[in-house]
Amino acid sequence: MKALHFGAGNIGRGFIGKLLADAGIQLTFADVNQVVLDALNARHSYQVHVVGENEQVDTVSGVNAVSSIGDDVVDLIAHVDLITTAVGPVVLERIAPAIAKGLVKRKAQGVDAPLNIIACENMVRGTTQLKGHVMNALPEDAKAWVEEHVGFVDSAVDRIVPPSASATNDPLEVTVETFSEWIVDKTQFKGALPNIPGMELTDNLMAFVERKLFTLNTGHAITAYLGKLAGHQTIRDAILDESIRAVVKGAMEESGAVLIKRYGFDADKHAAYIQKILGRFENPYLKDDVERVGRQPLRKLSAGDRLIKPLLGTLEYGLPHVNLVKGIAAAMHFRSDEDPQAQELAALITEKGPQAALAQISGLDANSDVVAEAVNAYNATK
C-alpha cells in the first residue's frame, strides 16, 4: 500500500506518519519546508520520543518526501492508495489545487483503483471541508469520476505533540505523548476498509468528535486560560494547582453530561476518560506552554468550538454549567503579545464591554442569563 501525507510537521511525523510507516505502508511526506524535505530524503528515517511513564525512542524508517507545491506531488496522487493530511485547518484550502490536479491526472491515466483521503486535523469533519475545496478546483468533467472513485473520509485525531527543542538540533526529531487516538468514519471509504493498527473505524464519528472536543479540547483550553491568569508557565503546573484542577474537572464533567445525554456514552467509562485526560495534562515530560494552548481565543470562543458548543449543550438539556462559564470568563482574560487574536479580543472588550464582546464572538444572546453569568465571572476574576 502506498500513502502520501501532507504536512511533515510534528503531528505529521509524530502521529499519523508514524502510524502509517509502522503499518508497513510505503509513505511519502509532502511539505514546503525544504530543510525537513532534504533531511527526510537524505536519511529516510527519523526518531520519535514517546514520553510518559515508560519513555521510549522509536525509529520511523522507509520514508520519502516531496515538495507539496511541485509536479512530483501531482504524479504521486495519480498512483497512491491513501492520502492523509496534518497541515492545520487553514492550509487545507491551499493544498486542494494540487490534490485536484493529481486526481485529474489519475483519471487521465485510467487509474480506477479506489483512493481514500483523510484529513487529520483538529476540526470537525475536516475532510468534508477539504472535499469542498478540491471539488471547487476540479474541472466539471472530472467531478463525477472523483465522486465514484475517491473516498473523502472524516476523522477525529487526538495526540498531544508540543513543540520541543531537540537536544541534537535534529530537524526531524519529535516528542509525543504515549496516548493517541485516530477514529475514522468507515461509512465514507471507497473500496475495502484499510487495516492500519492505531486507526479505529466507527459508523458514529460525531459522537467521538464531540467527546474529544468537549473533553480534551475543552479541558486543555480552560487549563491554559486559568493557568495564565494564575501565572503558571505550563499545562502541568496549572493542572497541579488544586483550585484550577477543580474547575477543569468540573467543566469536563458538565460537558460530559451533555455527551451522555446526546450519545448515550456510559457514565462510568466517561468518568474514566476524564481521569485519563487529567493524567495526560500532568505528564511531566510534555513541556506544554499555557500560552501556546491558549492562543487564538476568538476561534476558541466561537459557537462551534470547545467552550461555547458544550455550553450550548447544557442549555439545550437544562444542565449545570458553572465551571464552563468560569472557563469562558478566563478565556476572555487571555492576553498575549505573540497572538493577534488575543490583542483583537482585548480591543473588542475595551471598545464594547465584556457583554457585547462575548455575544459578538460567541453568537450567544447578549441579554441571556448565561452571558450575564459569564460577565459576572469575568468581572470577579479581574
Curated annotation (Swiss-Prot):
SUPFAM superfamilies: 6-phosphogluconate dehydrogenase C-terminal domain-like, NAD(P)-binding Rossmann-fold domains
GO cellular component, one term: cytosol
Cross-referenced PROSITE patterns: MANNITOL_DHGENASE
GO biological process: mannitol catabolic process
Keyword NAD: yes
Keyword terms of this UniProt record: NAD, Oxidoreductase
Pfam families: Mannitol_dh, Mannitol_dh_C
Gene3D superfamilies cross-referenced by the UniProt entry: N-(1-d-carboxylethyl)-l-norvaline Dehydrogenase, domain 2, NAD(P)-binding Rossmann-like Domain
Catalysed conversion reaction: D-mannitol 1-phosphate + NAD(+) = beta-D-fructose 6-phosphate + NADH + H(+)
Binding site residues for NAD(+): A3, L4, H5, F6, G7, A8, G9, N10, I11, G12, R13, G14
EC number: 1.1.1.17
Any one GO molecular-function label of the UniProt entry: mannitol-1-phosphate 5-dehydrogenase activity
InterPro entries: 6-PGluconate_DH-like_C_sf (IPR008927), 6PGD_dom2 (IPR013328), Mannitol_1_phos_5_DH (IPR023028), Mannitol_DH (IPR000669), Mannitol_DH_C (IPR013118), Mannitol_DH_CS (IPR023027), Mannitol_DH_N (IPR013131), NAD(P)-bd_dom_sf (IPR036291)
HAMAP family for this protein: Mannitol_dehydrog
Annotated family: Belongs to the mannitol dehydrogenase family.
PANTHER family noted in UniProt: ALTRONATE OXIDOREDUCTASE-RELATED, MANNITOL-1-PHOSPHATE 5-DEHYDROGENASE
Name this polypeptide is given: Mannitol-1-phosphate 5-dehydrogenase
Gene name tied to this protein: mtlD
